[in-house]
Amino acid sequence: MSEGKSPVAPIRRGGRSTILRSPMLLLGLLAAQFAIAQLLTGVQFGDAPRNMHWGLLSFERPAYLLGEADTSERIKGFPPNPESLGPNGLWRGGYGGLHPWWGPVVPLIFASVWGVTRSYTLLQLVVPVAGGATVILTYMIARDLLDQRRALLAAAFLSCFPLFREYSSVSYTETISALWITAALLCYLRGRTAFTIFFGTLACLSKMDMLAMYSGIIVTCALWDVLRHEGRRPLAQHIAVLVFPLLIAAPWIWYHTLAAGHSAATQGISADLFRFLLPQMIELTFYAPWHIALLTLVGIGAAVVAGIRGRAMSAMPTMLLGAWIGLGILITLVYAATPRAGNSPRVIIPALPALAVLFAAGLFRLPPRVRHVLSVYLIALFTVVNIIVIGYESVRFGEPIRAAEPAFAALRETERGFVLTPLYWETLLYTRQPATWFEGDPDFEHNIMHNMTNFKVYIESNPIRYVLIPRTGDITSPEVRAYLARHARAIDSGEMTLYVITKP
């Protein structure tokens, strides 16, 4: 129990059952919102379709997890003729495989759900369910360390935090990592060694950054316990929860990353890239201009500092939560300097449960006026940002998927062949047809899709059987569309047109 736990407010007679049920109802709504958003919008964007595709591929071809190439995707394109048409040379990479930073846990989860249900709806609910479970586990940690009121505050803060809400509604993997590490550290705080090892292993085998985060937190807590001679936990327990997950994860790390010749995540980090990406990552944390994002971080940080300085919890849990956040920030900073990492700050998502608990611990220790202003500001910001993001993504990403569904249905019924389409991951996922495009090379795309001669040679030289493009727009030139009209059978699929290439 925490040192600073406040007494529970008295319950009025006659309203006991309603008051006791309402916090659980609120918690359930907070946890369910991610699944509701996914069911209502159907949004998947960025790497989300790819992540699910890797799961289905792991079910269809288990050797994929052991390093076999994915021969169903050439998203960087086939070799052009002449090669100068693809000046960046990304097509030289050939067929792709499982990312070297990934562990086997997430693909196996997707594979299991698909293998049992064959349902895209349930497949797309895996991460939203994980997000809801993470909110509940965050509540449980805060309830153990604080009280019910602040535990609900922690759950609400996490579930409405724009970055967490967005990525817990689609099939990105950071929320699953957050689930495992939150479960592991809840068990660690409760002294459940076996369950800590189990969930810690799942965290370490989700992504390589989780191995660093989990082991760093445990080492920090063990050193704190030993150096302060508190003896809250036997040294053997610290060693067990640290060593066993690392030993279990070691064969995968050796086989999938080191022996395969993949470089470490920190190799080739760039200070110039860091200076370029970090401001963008700060803005994208709250989907706000940098000065508003920094102001928001200062306000949240003030509550966190108040919780730590006010000793709202005992020393060990405070140290654990602080190390959790600190390592999350460190991993994010390294990510910002890593080539090909992107500008998304989502790698900090597994540390957000700790931020939520410390925020809840400190908010009520701020001066009343400051607390009121900060609360109103965060409620307004989170509400406005989440509404805008949900609406934007429903139009920007949900509508193209819905528009392509007739074409996807037609492709599921046709012979196997590569599909040339800008919706390459979506096509791979929802049709199980191989797909290709010109990802990351707009010059390559323009040279092929806006020149009839180049397009003709490219199509004839490579195993492309279908072309799936929007019915209108400038994705291709009128000359290329005219060529397709003459040499392909068009299947009108609403907003999309599917061309079946006629080859000799």
Label each residue range with its predicted role:
Residues 214, 234-299, 327-332:
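Membrane-lumen/periplasm interface segments of specific transmembrane helices
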Residues 378-428, 438-445, 453, 459:
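Membrane-embedded, lumen/periplasm-facing catalytic core of multi-pass transferases
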